[in-house]
C-alpha cells in the first residue's frame, strides 16, 4: 500500500482525541474554531490545539512522541485547512518534540515561539534529548528543528489575533488568549484533573508568580480554557484554572509541614485522591524537598 498523506489521515484519525469547543450552533458564526488533541498518560496527557479559520489554521504545539505528532498531522489533514503557523508555547519537550514530524507534512508552515521560550529550549534541548531519547526509542524525534523567535506577541489568523500573554514574570511560561472566541490555551500553567508539575517551580516566589498568572487568566473571563495537560473528558472551562490555583495554594500549605517527600506526597494524594499524573507529584515532592535535582 502506498503510504500517502491521505492514507495517514485515514489510519490515524480514529486515535486522535479531538474536541470541538464551539457551542452548538455557534460554529456557523464564530470566526475561529478549535480542535484539541489530548495525549495519553505516557505523554503526560499533554494537549495540542488546532485553531481554524475558514481556510487557514494555526497549530499550538506538536506533541511529545512521534506517534503523537502523527496523530496531530492527521487532525490537521482532516480539517482541510492550510496550516500557516506552528506555535510552540512552552519549553518542555512534550510541547515541541513533534516539530520534525509536523514539518515533514507541512513544510511551508512557520514554526515560531517567544524569545524567552526559544532561549530556554536552546539551553535545555541537549539534556532533554539525552534523558528522553533512550526511553522513547523509535518514538523519539530524529531531529529537533528549532523554532524562530516571534516578532511581537501576537499571531494573526484571518484577521483574528492570538495574543501571547504572561510574559511579565517567568516569560517562558506564557499562555495564549484568543479574544474573538474568549479562549485561553494555558500551556504548562493550567492542569485539568492532574497533579501539577511543581518540579519547575522550586521557590515560593516562582509559585506565587504562577498563581498570579492564573489569577490574570480568571480576570479575562474566558468561556473556554484548554489546559496544557488534562485528563480525557475534563471540562474545557475556567474550572481548570481554578483547580490549578487551588492546588498551588494547597501545595504551598503542605510543603513546610512535610518532613520529607513521602509526607508531602501523602498529603497531596489525600487532598486530591482522584488526580492523575502521579509522576508529577512524586518528582515535584522530591525536588521541592531537596531530595532530587531537576
Description of each model-found segment:
Residues 10-20:
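Bacterial N-terminal signal peptides
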Residues 22, 120, 219-224, 232-294:
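Accessory terminal helices/loops
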Residues 1-7:
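N-terminal secretory signal peptides that target proteins for export/translocation
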Residues 23-29:
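Boundary at the C-terminal end of the N-terminal hydrophobic targeting segment
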Residues 29-78, 175-178, 182-188:
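Conserved beta-strand hairpin/beta-sheet module of binuclear metal-dependent hydrolase folds
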Residues 64-65, 120-243, 247-250:
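Metallo-beta-lactamase
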Residues 67-113:
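Active-site metal-binding motif and surrounding structural segment of the metallo-beta-lactamase
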Amino acid at each position: 500500500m502506498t503510504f500517502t498523506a491521505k492514507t495517514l489521515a485515514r489510519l490515524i484519525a480514529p486515535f486522535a482525541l479531538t474536541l470541538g469547543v464551539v457551542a452548538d450552533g455557534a460554529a456557523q458564526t464564530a470566526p475561529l474554531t478549535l480542535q484539541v488533541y489530548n495525549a495519553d498518560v505516557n505523554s503526560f496527557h499533554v494537549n495540542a490545539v488546532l485553531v481554524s479559520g475558514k481556510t487557514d489554521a494555526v497549530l499550538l504545539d506538536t506533541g511529545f512522541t512521534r506517534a503523537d505528532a502523527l496523530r496531530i498531522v492527521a487532525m490537521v489533514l482532516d480539517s482541510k485547512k492550510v496550516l500557516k503557523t506552528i506555535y510552540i508555547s512552552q519549553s518542555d519537550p512534550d510541547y515541541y518534540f513533534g516539530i520534525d514530524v509536523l514539518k515533514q507534512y507541512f513544510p511551508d508552515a512557520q514554526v515560531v515561539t517567544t524569545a524567552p521560550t526559544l532561549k530556554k529550549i536552546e539551553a535545555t534541548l541537549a539534556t532533554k534529548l539525552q534523558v528522553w531519547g533512550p526511553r522513547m526509542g523509535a518514538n523519539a524525534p530524529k531531529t529537533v528543528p528549532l523554532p524562530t523567535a516571534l516578532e511581537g506577541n501576537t499571531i494573526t489568523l484571518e484577521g483574528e489575533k492570538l495574543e501571547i500573554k504572561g510574559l511579565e514574570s517567568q516569560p517562558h511560561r506564557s499562555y495564549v488568549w484568543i479574544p474573538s472566541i474568549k479562549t485561553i490555551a494555558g500551556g504548562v500553567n493550567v492542569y485539568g484533573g492532574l497533579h501539577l508539575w511543581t518540579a519547575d517551580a522550586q521557590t515560593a516566589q516562582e509559585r506565587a508568580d504562577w498563581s498570579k498568572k492564573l489569577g490574570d487568566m480568571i480576570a479575562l473571563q474566558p468561556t473556554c480554557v484548554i489546559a496544557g495537560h488534562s485528563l480525557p473528558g475534563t471540562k474545557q472551562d475556567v474550572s481548570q484554572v481554578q483547580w490549578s490555583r487551588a492546588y498551588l495554594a494547597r501545595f504551598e500549605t503542605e510543603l513546610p509541614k512535610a518532613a520529607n517527600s513521602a509526607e508531602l506526597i501523602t498529603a497531596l494524594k489525600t487532598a486530591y485522591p482522584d488526580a492523575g499524573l502521579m509522576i508529577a507529584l512524586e518528582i515535584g515532592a522530591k525536588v521541592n524537598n531537596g531530595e532530587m535535582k531537576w
